[in-house]
Amino acid sequence: YTENVDGINVHIYGAHIFHTSEKRVWDYVNQFAEFNRYTNSPVALYKGELYNMPFNMNTFNKLWGVTTPAEALAKIEEEKKEAGITEPKNLEEQAISLVGKTIYEKLVKGYTEKQWGKKATELPSFIIKRLPVRFIYDNNYFNDLYQGIPMGGYTKMVENMLEGTEVKLNCDYFDNKEEFDSIADKIIFTGPIDKYYDYCYGELEYRSLRFETETYPVDNYQGNAVVNYTEYEIPYTRIIEHKHFEFGKTLGKEAEGIAATKTIVTREYPDSWNKEKEPYYTVNNERNSELYKKYKELADKEGKVLFCGRLGQYCYYDMDKVILSALNTADEVL
């Protein structure tokens, strides 16, 4: 969801960069918007030093002064050998076993602990199955074939998707359940699956986010769309400067003079979750996975209701994956 503020498209719920390798998904979204060529190349700030993300040869050169892939690989393998971890018992040990101590302590530890609200030694190892390490000089965060930002913003793209469709807002499904059920052959429910069943087995857990957005009287605040802050002592995980998603360009001639002298930035803070907050990330530990299985068994018995999306299926979805899931579901139902 984006809002146009003085010609700058502001990502209200944090940075969203569209990326996919699915041609079907790319062709689908391009029916509703033209995409720019934005490439996500975040940087990480740790104790006043900037490092390129994801971990690549530019990162390794900054960390150790190495210039060749062989030197970088040798350095990482040396640190992994020194750690001597064969069976990681927690996230910290898992990360060190994958990339060594230097990368972990500077670029993984603090960020991850802020993200989850727990010490890395208290987090299960399975949270990090792998850490992408590239032995090339390439700062493109994603490996996908297609990438970009919809020109005019995501809100405009969704408006185009919904053209000709009746949409009712601010309607609570549970307050109007009988009415909605009576007029539809199928119900697509994208809310929390545990709420649908009145939390009969207990509540699923989530992590939330909160955002602080400010306007500065400068045309360029940080020189990049996304800067990660990996020190634990800094409470936010990243700062987003929205105009860089569209290369500093403004929307409409009337906005050019305004946006040239101002910029809008958002600080992103990980947050605990309760029912009054937005659920952003599922917490897929053993307890929640078992709980979801119970709700899924109930959902599988439904003849009319389909549970979709992050909340309905209790899983993390990138934008392209949830669109592909929706298209596949439509193929099955229609």
Labelled PLM ranges:
Residues 1-11, 17-72, 131-136:
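A conserved beta-strand/loop capping segment in the N-terminal third of enzymes
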Residues 9, 34, 166-168, 304:
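Conserved beta-strand segments of alpha/beta enzyme cores
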Residues 12-16, 147-148, 211-214:
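A short acidic, glycine-rich active-site loop
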Residues 17-18, 84, 147-154, 228-229, ...:
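Aromatic-acidic/polar surface patches that form glycan- and anion
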Residues 38-40, 170-172, 242, 308:
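Conserved beta-strand termini and adjacent loop/short-helix elements that scaffold enzyme active sites
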Residues 44-51, 58-186, 190, 195-197:
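Active-site/ligand-binding neighborhood in enzyme catalytic cores
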Residues 184, 195-334:
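C-terminal segments that line or cap access tunnels to active or ligand-binding sites in enzymes
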